[in-house]
Curated annotation (Swiss-Prot):
Oligomer and partners: Weakly associates with the stable SPT16-POB3 heterodimer to form the FACT (yFACT or SNP) complex, which is associated with nucleosomes. Multiple molecules of NHP6 (NHP6A and/or NHP6B) are required to recruit the SPT16-POB3 heterodimer to DNA.
Coiled-coil stretches noted in the UniProt entry, renumbered to this chain: none
Name of the molecule in the record: Non-histone chromosomal protein 6A
Cell cycle is among the record's keywords: no
One matching Pfam family: HMG_box
Length: 93
């Protein structure tokens, strides 16, 4: 005998405020944004998922010295985000 299930209740996600500051990018994201077009030009018939995989492989192959500029950009972006977030929260309160 099968018992009827109760319908699942949908949880509604809170709408994101369009005025909220953009989140900080990671060092990998700065690297990926800079190198995505290069990977695509080297492999024109590659799929979207494979581009990400190639970028991940390239990122892992970098030495800490080669990653340094991207990590510096990420630190600067994190500071930008934190200051913008502070300003944003002050306007809400």
């Amino acid at each position: 005998m099968v018992t009827p299930r109760e319908p699942k209740k949908r949880t509604t996600r809170k709408k994101k405020d369009p005025n909220a500051p953009k989140r900080a990018l990671s060092a990998y994201m700065f690297f990926a944004n800079e190198n995505r077009d290069i990977v695509r030009s080297e492999n024109p018939d590659i799929t979207f998922g494979q581009v990400g995989k190639k970028l991940g492989e390239k990122w892992k192959a970098l030495t800490p010295e080669e990653k340094q500029p991207y990590e510096a950009k990420a630190q600067a972006d994190k500071k930008r985000y934190e200051s913008e977030k502070e300003l944003y929260n002050a306007t809400l309160a």
